[in-house]
Amino acid sequence: MNEFAERIERDFPVRRKEKEKVDFRTWLVYTLKELGYSPKLESGTSALSAGGNVTNVVVGDIEKAKIVLAAHYDTGVREVLPPLICPTRPATYMLYEALIPLLALAVSFLISFGVTFALNMPNMTLPLFLLLLVVTLFYPKYGKSETNNKNANTSGVIALLEVAKALTPRYRGEVCFLFLDGGTQGSKGASRLIHAHPELKKKSVVVLDCVGEGDELLILPGKASRWNDKLLDTILEQFSNSERKTCFLKTDGLVHYPSDNHAFMGGTVICACKKVKGFGRCILPRKTEEIDEENLSLLCDGLCKLVMYYNPQNT
């Protein structure tokens, strides 16, 4: 197992509550310093549902970096239904997500109807139904934490650490690494950084999310990045396939990936997918048993070359 993956899975598998994240950040900062970097903590006033405020870990100079690599390190609440992401089939993903509130409505109604029917109190059905709905609103804050976070998004953090480790001192000043907080809560960490560093709006930001399992590394440029010919050409030239894995840059069609990439104007997201009949390219984070080291190797190699050869001045 990858050395970073082993340590994180052993000591910091859940990073949702404030103490869990503080412990992880302490290790992360120490590890980055051991690799020769000077990480900084940047905190904001945005409150998080599980307590504490947004705290990002920034490695490098955002203003001087020619490219930014990012991944969120926080983990979320355990969803009622197994998480499913279909990047190239947005309608399928949104319909699946819509099942959660519908399920909450159905369960709340059945419980309220069953209880009031058994007690012969039909007038209390609606009040109890509404009360149960209010209770479900507090689930994101008080619900059980997701425990299997290998793919979402321990894999993205590990990939960043592998790139940081592999880069020679000559190229380290040309990249900025962002370890983002609040990724599971509307990209609060990314939004905080953009507010503090407006120059991020002009940067090419590559976000890594759910890269730990899948036969295809799917690269999805955002609306602005689709017109960045230099970035796309460099990705095509520097990312390579292996015997079992492919890297696919998708620049056409309707796509949607629910991560921090949407916060950045020049955002591009990289994820790892497997093809599931009826759903197309899919990511099933909860089913991941182990992070695929071949994925990490391909990503690390491609991203290191991207840092070395990408020249935004020519765009």
Residue ranges, per PLM feature:
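Solvent-exposed loop/turn segments at secondary-structure junctions
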Residues: 47, 73-76, 182-185, 210-214, ...
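Acidic/histidine-rich catalytic neighborhood of metal-dependent amide-processing enzymes
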Residues: 113-230, 253, 260-261
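Short glycine/serine- and small hydrophobic-enriched flexible loop segments
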Residues: 30, 161-168, 305-308
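A structural signal for isolated positions on well-ordered beta-strands in alpha/beta enzyme cores
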Residues: 40, 68, 176-178
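Active-site-adjacent substrate-binding region
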Residues: 34, 45, 214-315
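N-terminal capping segment at the start of a domain
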Residues: 1-23, 29-31, 35, 48, ...
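A non-catalytic alpha/beta surface segment that caps or lines the substrate-entry region
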Residues: 13-63, 80-116
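Extended, hydrophilic extramembrane loops/domains of integral membrane proteins
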Residues: 66-81
